[in-house]
Curated annotation (Swiss-Prot):
Keyword Transmembrane: yes
Alphabetical GO biological process terms: adenylate cyclase-inhibiting G protein-coupled receptor signaling pathway; amyloid-beta clearance; apoptotic cell clearance; cell surface receptor signaling pathway; innate immune response; phagocytosis, engulfment; positive regulation of ERK1 and ERK2 cascade; receptor-mediated endocytosis
Protein function: Pattern recognition receptor (PRR) which binds Gram-positive and Gram-negative bacteria. Also plays a role in binding of unopsonized particles by alveolar macrophages. Binds to the secretoglobin SCGB3A2.
Gene label: MARCO
Chain segments annotated as transmembrane: 44-64
Stated name of the protein: Macrophage receptor MARCO
Residues linked to a glycan: 83, 136
Topology, Cytoplasmic side: 1-43
Residues annotated as domain Collagen-like: 147-419
Tissues showing expression: Expressed in alveolar macrophages (at protein level). Detected in macrophages from various tissues including thymus, kidney, Kupffer cells of liver, and spleen.
Amino acid sequence: MRNKKILKEDELLSETQQAAFHQIAMEPFEINVPKPKRRNGVNFSLAVVVIYLILLTAGAGLLVVQVLNLQARLRVLEMYFLNDTLAAEDSPSFSLLQSAHPGEHLAQGASRLQVLQAQLTWVRVSHEHLLQRVDNFTQNPGMFRIKGEQGAPGLQGHKGAMGMPGAPGPPGPPAEKGAKGAMGRDGATGPSGPQGPPGVKGEAGLQGPQGAPGKQGATGTPGPQGEKGSKGDGGLIGPKGETGTKGEKGDLGLPGSKGDRGMKGDAGVMGPPGAQGSKGDFGRPGPPGLAGFPGAKGDQGQPGLQGVPGPPGAVGHPGAKGEPGSAGSPGRAGLPGSPGSPGATGLKGSKGDTGLQGQQGRKGESGVPGPAGVKGEQGSPGLAGPKGAPGQAGQKGDQGVKGSSGEQGVKGEKGERGENSVSVRIVGSSNRGRAEVYYSGTWGTICDDEWQNSDAIVFCRMLGYSKGRALYKVGAGTGQIWLDNVQCRGTESTLWSCTKNSWGHHDCSHEEDAGVECSV
């Protein structure tokens, strides 16, 4: 009987060991100890398991922290995509994400988050399995050679962990382009801009032909002295004229009145001794003249064209007495004067006594030079010579220096809107196309009857251009035909000042709409 009990115990033990072996084979991480012999091995195994659990718990905690961080980042990313719009596109964090991963940061963040969630689930399941193994290891009676009771049937296993997420799918097709938005309303007319700078000084014109010399006018009363003018531009230098023929010596003029005492001149060449004249009286000094202001020195002009010498003029009428001139340079020695008329013969005196021979007298002092004669009267102007041939056009002068821009004027108040305002426009391009006018709240065209370049110039002037050219066959317009038979001279400021039919009166169709081509 005892042997049978021993055999039964051996069979039970072997069955228990086989069951434990099968259980160990099913659990891949369970320590395989088929025959523990000492208590020290069990303690060592428990210590190893505890250390492993601690490390696993620490690793799971780190994974949880990383998952929480990624979830926080995911919430931040979701904020940018609420209602399919980027509400916070200008934030620094969004721009930083875009600069770091411009096309991949969203897909990579979502895939990494899914991978971490799967790893966290796997760690949680592994942790549960490890706890079950520890329970099996500590509660297994076969490990301590104790017959255990038959265990209750195990609970139904938990649902398996979610599988690893699949690879992200290919990007979807690009979205269709949205419909074009409605055209916005016309903006309000802005205030007029400030006044522009003054224009550049124009080029100097061509020199005109030399005019005929005018007759000498009567001497006018001297006007008040004007202010000193600014320095003028240098004139063109005319050509040097031919030397005139020397005039004949004029008749001896009447003796002039005694003039003021002149300044002492340089000693002239001694003339032949003349008859000793009587000593004249000293004249009274004249009043000093007003000192004139020196004029600004002009630039040297270019030589003018050679003129045709005119015939000698006739003797002119005596002019008014001129003001005393400044002292001139010393003149050349004058010709010897004509001998004076002999005096009347005196009575013959009685012969006087022979006187003593006197001493030779000293040489007398040189007499005071006589006053300068009055300047001869100016001859009358000669007959006008034949008109010279027009000279060649001079070279184009250098462009003048651009004047300084004036100070910006004060901005004027905005004017009130006028009633029945009229304006013009070009349909086609900015400066070429069909001419249209705005009248009574409606745009209309112009008939090309009598439409010429002068009309186009006035039309372009209304748009700020300076030149214009009339065009025809520029394409038919629509709506009203406001003007017909427009006839401008080209100097008008607007078309409304030109001769034309009344507004809306015409005999044309839109095939005859007028056009313009404007230029600066």
